[in-house]
């Protein structure tokens, strides 16, 4: 079984975020960046499934600047087999991300897509649901465990008041609510990453991408 996992590059959660003086965004220059923690959980889940013999290949995808290759290498050091980067110098909004991921899914043809439930920078929690709708796939959100049983997945979801257990036939899109080995980090740091651009993806899969314009961000306590 082939699994596709997404990984977003975000500001390290332990870094104090500073708003730019003109209010057009937050400072990212010379700021420590890392893989989104929820995406890290998703990669970990995929790796556990591979170790259990249920998964044969893990493909990790990131959309963003060239430096996102570092994020992909982190995921590959954890156990992912291949990395795909769709480069974009601009911030890509959730619906556009979902459309780009749909094109990649149609090309890679995974049996399962695992995504972090949300990114810690914008907390949108939108891409997974949008991707599921665009693909017409069943989905399970806020999951804590996935167990593969033949051609189906037994999923445990965290809900108000307890846990919900579902059985989904593939194909499925799941949102997951660490592992590092030095040898893996060294080996994967030399691995090739397939890089593309939004324009290249759109030339194969015609997409209409919308853009959200940010006017101003205010520091906490300032209105």
Residue ranges and their predicted role:
Residues 1-223:
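N-terminal glycine-rich FAD/FM-binding segment characteristic of electron-transfer flavoproteins
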């Amino acid at each position: 079984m082939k699994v596709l996992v997404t990984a977003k590059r975000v500001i390290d959660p332990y870094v104090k975020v500073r708003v730019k003086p003109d209010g057009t965004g937050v400072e990212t220059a010379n700021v420590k960046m890392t893989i989104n923690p929820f995406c890290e959980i998703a990669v970990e889940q995929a790796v556990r499934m591979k170790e259990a013999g249920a998964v044969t290949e893990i493909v990790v995808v990131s959309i963003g600047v060239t430096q996102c290759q570092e994020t992909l290498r982190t995921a590959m050091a954890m156990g992912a087999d291949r990395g795909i980067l769709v480069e974009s110098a601009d911030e890509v909004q959730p619906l556009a991300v979902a459309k780009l991921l749909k094109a990649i899914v149609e090309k890679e043809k995974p049996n399962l897509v695992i995504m972090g439930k949300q990114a810690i920078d914008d907390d949108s929690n939108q891409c997974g649901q949008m991707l599921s709708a665009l693909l017409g796939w069943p989905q399970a959100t806020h999951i804590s465990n996935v167990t593969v049983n033949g051609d189906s997945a037994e999923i445990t979801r965290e809900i108000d008041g307890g846990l919900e257990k579902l059985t989904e036939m593939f194909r499925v899109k799941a949102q997951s609510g660490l592992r590092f080995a030095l040898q893996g980090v060294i080996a994967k740091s030399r691995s090739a990453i397939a890089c593309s651009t939004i324009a290249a993806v759109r030339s194969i899969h015609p997409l209409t991408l919308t853009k959200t314009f940010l006017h101003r961000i205010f520091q906490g306590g300032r209105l």
